[in-house]
Amino acid sequence: MRIVFDIGGSVLVPEDPDIDFIKAIAYELVKISEDHEVAVVVGGGKVARKYIQAAKEFTLNETFKDYIGIHITRANAMLLIAALGEKAYPFVVQDFRKAWEVIQLKKIPIMGGTHPGHTTDAVAALLAEYLQADLLVVVTNVDGVYDSDPKKNPNAKKLDRITVDQLVEIAMQEESKAGGSGVVDALAAKFIQRGKIKTYIVGKKDAYHLFDVIKGKHSGTVVEP
């Protein structure tokens, strides 16, 4: 299989880098890459949001602030490259064609953000579409897709299996709310829909066992194309 992993920045670096987690997923990714083609996109998470918030004191330029976030995602990506060692391509990959070339070299391409206005979820979905991946695995700080925000609603129900059309609907509903924070943003959901990409959305606990996740053994949400 060809698999794209979308690792949330807040999972990798919640406040400070989670060294044990980074070691664990690096081990899992190397193991998976022995039998499958693997590409990874890393997010900026809380650290990126802090920098972007600070930048608001100095500039109203949204594109400039997006670039700040992109640089943070690439710093996180470099951390994972270091953890993966020789199995990873030694530089942060910045475009999809290069990711394809790296895969042909039997290495793991690691990407961060690419363009202003695109989240790393959107980048991962586009990369999966470009590579014609068999599977997209989204690792987030929520253990799947819920029918409402579980941080605000203790009775929120996790959805074990949904269609991509449902994912788009849920993402758009969350995005329309003030402060809404769905597990996947609406643009990424639409790219998943367009690319007809089978997607697993899992939490940090499952991410310690990515080798099992790709076999469908997880407690997250399956998104059917």
UniProtKB/Swiss-Prot annotation:
UMP binds at residues 44, 66, 114-120. The keyword Nucleus does not apply. One of its GO terms (molecular function) is ATP binding. Catalyzes the reversible phosphorylation of UMP to UDP. It is found in: Cytoplasm. Keywords: ATP-binding, Cytoplasm, Kinase, Nucleotide-binding, Pyrimidine biosynthesis, Transferase. Disulfide bonds: none annotated. Inhibited by UTP. It comes from Thermococcus kodakarensis (strain ATCC BAA-918 / JCM 12380 / KOD1). Homohexamer. The gene is pyrH. One of its GO terms (cellular component) is cytoplasm. Its EC number is 2.7.4.22. Its main location: cytoplasm. InterPro entries: AceGlu_kinase-like_sf (IPR036393), Asp/Glu/Uridylate_kinase (IPR001048), Uridylate_kinase (IPR011817), Uridylate_kinase_arch/spir (IPR011818). One of its GO terms (biological process) is UDP biosynthetic process. This is Uridylate kinase. It catalyses: UMP + ATP = UDP + ADP. ATP binds at residues 9-10, 45, 49, 140-141, 146, 149. Belongs to the UMP kinase family. Pathway: Pyrimidine metabolism; CTP biosynthesis via de novo pathway; UDP from UMP (UMPK route): step 1/1. The keyword Amino-acid biosynthesis does not apply.
